[in-house]
A protein has these predicted regions:
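Hydrophobic residues positioned within well-ordered beta-strands of beta-sheet architectures
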Residues: 4-6, 56, 68, 84, ...
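A conserved amphipathic terminal alpha-helix motif
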Residues: 96, 102-139
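Glycine-rich portal/gate segments that line the openings of hydrophobic small-molecule binding cavities
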Residues: 26-78, 91, 96, 124, ...
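Hydrophobic ligand-binding cavity/cleft-lining segments
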Residues: 1-39, 139
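Solvent-exposed residues in well-ordered beta-strands and their adjoining turns
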Residues: 9-13, 49, 73, 89, ...
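Amphipathic hydrophobic-ligand
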Residues: 78-85
């Protein structure tokens, strides 16, 4: 089982970070790899910049604990059993955001490329989230 974990520290209170990150349908606002994202009936549709469609089901979500878990239900990617968790942890006026996933590649030789792609997408998304929230907090 492949695993991915990316984290970022954000100089803003966790409730401010969660106000942006906690809405699964708005993930396209802060993940550069996505051209668009929408939510309907617990399912999120993500359109990648190259036009590929990924459909995800939100499995669990808690505003109180500031996290959600989702799984891919439809994707052109060569993987299965994909599950991911996005969480915002508070540290006073600062936040620690984690984005983790695990999945099985359709073949072992594809795993390194898939892990690398998700690491890049998660890292770029978290950096964009940080910049967006910190800019809004400073305004």
């Amino acid at each position: 089982m492949a695993q991915v974990l990316e984290t970022v520290e954000i100089n803003a209170p966790p409730d401010e970070v969660w106000a942006v990150a906690g809405d699964p349908g708005r993930i396209g606002d802060w993940v550069p790899a996505l051209a668009d994202s929408t939510m309907e009936n617990g399912y999120r549709s993500c359109t990648m910049q190259d036009g590929a469609e990924i459909v995800e089901r939100i499995v669990e979500r808690s505003d109180e604990q500031r996290y959600y878990v989702y799984e891919i239900t439809s994707s052109p990617l060569p993987l299965r059993s994909y599950s991911s968790r996005l969480a915002v942890h508070g540290h006073g006026d600062h936040s620690h955001v984690t984005w983790a996933a695990q999945f099985e590649a359709e073949s072992a030789d594809l795993e390194p490329d898939l892990v690398g792609a998700f690491e890049r997408i998660y890292r770029e998304g978290l950096i964009t989230l940080r910049d967006h929230v910190e800019f809004a907090a400073a305004a």
